[in-house]
Each structure stands twice: as structure tokens, then as C-alpha cells.
């Protein structure tokens, strides 16, 4: 894989060089990249929109109104939906509260929705997260998670190109056993491992939760934008055409998609 290693080095976003991926400076650099690169902003804005649309469509009967985004970091949720409480595990000037998915700082049944954009695979204890969903989210509410997909293109790229974090569909465990390990020590295939490979086991352990949707999406638009870790590959002016092409290729999303949106509702 020497060629891929050289390609990663060539395409790497230079503003991240030398930064600790678990430090606040890294998050601040990511935020600056999102603000600077319009194509990345459009991708992240689409992720936020997907969270909100799933919430409004599938949690409509929930009596609670409060919504929280986990791992808000460099994201756009606060700008697009200012009523959503933003949070992170690091003290950052642009989030509302410090919060971990395993320890939500809210009363029982007080939340309508929990959003997480590429956050779930960083959790140290996924079972604690689902227990917290069952406790803090009111019946009829739930969570919307956007995570790395598990189709052929995603497996290829996350295993061989986007390698800053592991991607292991055969991982024996759902969690890292030491909560003090860095969040970057993650398994990007975790949503597949827990909800697909071990889906029957997950449902048995959490009978009050129901997986409502698992929708693959996003490939070309993310790749050409470079995301937050790589250089942009096309002029910004090409973005509209790229998005049109991506929509035309939607029937191939199960094969090409790099992300998927997961919706889980608390039934009781």
C-alpha cells in the first residue's frame, strides 16, 4: 500500500500538520476548514438537514421538545438550527455544554432527539449510550446518527485511504474498554458491527429501542470536497454539477455511499 500512503500524504490538508487529533486546536482547525471550503460546508449542511428531517418525520409524536447534538465540534448545527443544544467532550467556545453520549446531563425523559454526526464510532461504551437514550429520551423520541457506511466503496476507502481511524467489521467488541483512551482510537465500522452484524443481540439488550431507518448516502460530493482532512479536488464552481451527478447515481447508493443515516426510536 505504498502508493496509497503517498497519495494520502499528497492530499493531506496542510493546516492539520502537527496537530494533536484529540486536542481543541484540531477541532478549531476543522472548524476553520468548514468555514473556508464551501463544498465541505454543503456536505455538512446536508448532514444537519438529514438529522432534522428524520427527527420531524419520525419523532413527531414525542411530547418532549429538547434536542442535543453530540460532538458538535466543527459542525454547522448551531448555525442552521440554533434551538438545538450543542455539546462536545472538550471545552470549546462554540458549544453550549460539555457532554458525553454515555452520560447525558439531562433529566429522565426530557429529550426529544439526540443527533450525532460521525460521533457514534468514537464512543468508549456504546451500551452505556443506548442505556442513556432509554433513560433521557422521552417515548416517541430517539436518535439520528450519521456514520461511515459499510458498503463496498466505504469499506475500500475507509480501510485503505481514510486510515486516521480504524475500520474493522470483524471487531469482537462493541466498545473500547478504557474510557481514557483518545477518541481518535475509534472503529469507523462500529455502526455496522452493533446494528447490522450484531443487530439481533442489540435488539435483545435494548427492547425499548427500535431501528427505524438505515439510509446510505453521500459519496462524490464528500470525496471531491476533501472533507476536513484532505485537500479539495475540484473547483468550487463544479460543486453543483457534482451534486446533480450524485443524485442521479442514487440507485447505486448501497454500493457507492460513504455515509449512512441511522434512526433509532425509543418505543417505551
Regions found by a protein language model. Give the residues of each.
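N-terminal, positively charged/glycine-rich alpha-helical extensions of SAM-dependent methyltransferases
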Residues: 1-40, 46-50
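Conserved alpha-helix/loop element of class I SAM-dependent methyltransferases that forms part
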Residues: 43-66
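Class I SAM-dependent methyltransferase SAM/SAH-binding core
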Residues: 65-104, 128
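A conserved beta-strand element that flanks and buttresses the S-adenosyl-L-methionine
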Residues: 115
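A short glycine-rich, Lys/Arg-flanked "PGG" loop and its adjoining helix->strand segment in the class I
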Residues: 127-139
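Conserved class I S-adenosyl-L-methionine
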Residues: 143-178
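Short alpha-helix
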Residues: 189-214
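Conserved Class I S-adenosyl-L-methionine
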Residues: 215-265
Amino acid at each position: 500500500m505504498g502508493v496509497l500512503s503517498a497519495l494520502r500524504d499528497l492530499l493531506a490538508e496542510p493546516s492539520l500538520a502537527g496537530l494533536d487529533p484529540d486536542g481543541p486546536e484540531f477541532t478549531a482547525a476543522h472548524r476553520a476548514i468548514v468555514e473556508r471550503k464551501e463544498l465541505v460546508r454543503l456536505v455538512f449542511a446536508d448532514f444537519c438537514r438529514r438529522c432534522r428531517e428524520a427527527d420531524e418525520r419520525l419523532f413527531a409524536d414525542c411530547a418532549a421538545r429538547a434536542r442535543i447534538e453530540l460532538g458538535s465540534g466543527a459542525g454547522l448545527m448551531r448555525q442552521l438550527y440554533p434551538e438545538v443544544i450543542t455539546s462536545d467532550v472538550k471545552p470549546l467556545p462554540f458549544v453550549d455544554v460539555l457532554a458525553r453520549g454515555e452520560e447525558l446531563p439531562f433529566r429522565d425523559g426530557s429529550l426529544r432527539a439526540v443527533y450525532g454526526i460521525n460521533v457514534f464510532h468514537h464512543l468508549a461504551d456504546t451500551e452505556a449510550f443506548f442505556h442513556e437514550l432509554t433513560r433521557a429520551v422521552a417515548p416517541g423520541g430517539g436518535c439520528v446518527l450519521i456514520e461511515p457506511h459499510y458498503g463496498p466503496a466505504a469499506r475500500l476507502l475507509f480501510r485503505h485511504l481514510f486510515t486516521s481511524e480504524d475500520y474493522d467489521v470483524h471487531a469482537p467488541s462493541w466498545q473500547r474498554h478504557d474510557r481514557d483512551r483518545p477518541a481518535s482510537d475509534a472503529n469507523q465500522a462500529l455502526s455496522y458491527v452493533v446494528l447490522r452484524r450484531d443487530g439481533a443481540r442489540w435488539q435483545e439488550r435494548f427492547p425499548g429501542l427500535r431501528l427505524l431507518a438505515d439510509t446510505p448516502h453521500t459519496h462524490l460530493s464528500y470525496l471531491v470536497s476533501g472533507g476536513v482532512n484532505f485537500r479539495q479536488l475540484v473547483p468550487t464552481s463544479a460543486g453543483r454539477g457534482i451534486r446533480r451527478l450524485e443524485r442521479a447515481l442514487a440507485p447505486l447508493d448501497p454500493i457507492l455511499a460513504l455515509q449512512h443515516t441511522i434512526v433509532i426510536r425509543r418505543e417505551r
